[in-house]
Amino acid sequence: PGDEYSTYVFAEKGKMHYCIPNLRQKLDRYYSFEAKTQKNPKIENMCKKIVKELDLSSNVNIQFKNTKNKIPKLIEINPRIGGTIILPSVSGINLPYLAVKLCLGEKIPTKKLTETKMIRYWKEVFIKDSETFEINNNSRI
């Protein structure tokens, strides 16, 4: 009944470096078509406990769904990046890059997150006689 969060977490040996709650605003089946990064202290604290308890490292996707009373409930813990991984990257924290740095034994930098909204949409691209084109409001058929 409540909001759903796909939270991007980056950790090292049980210590959380980053926690980026991603509010899934518009869904179609399981895909986010509108989402935004959004601070959420309750979810951030829950993620910190999960990371410590499970001694997690690297990228982890932790999903929550709020009850009607706005209490976040854990849905799943995924040992992978989520489907909207581009959103934290555009917001200032490139999590796949940080995973590479971790694997190379390099120091994980401190970065600042800027709250960002993502809108995903479909469009048609046509290929005809080796020409690629789109049909938009300015096109004539």
Predicted regions and their residues:
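ATP-dependent carboxylate/phosphate-activation module, predominantly the ATP-grasp catalytic core
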Residues: P1-D55, N66, N78-K101, Y121-E124
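Surface-exposed helix-capping loop/turn segments at secondary-structure junctions
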Residues: E53-S58, K107
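A short glycine-rich, hydrophobically flanked beta-strand micro-motif that places a catalytic Asp/Glu
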Residues: S57-N69
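Peripheral (often C-terminal) accessory segments that flank ATP-dependent C-N-forming ligase machineries
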Residues: T67, L98-I141
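Pre-DFG segment of protein kinase catalytic domains
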Residues: L74-E76
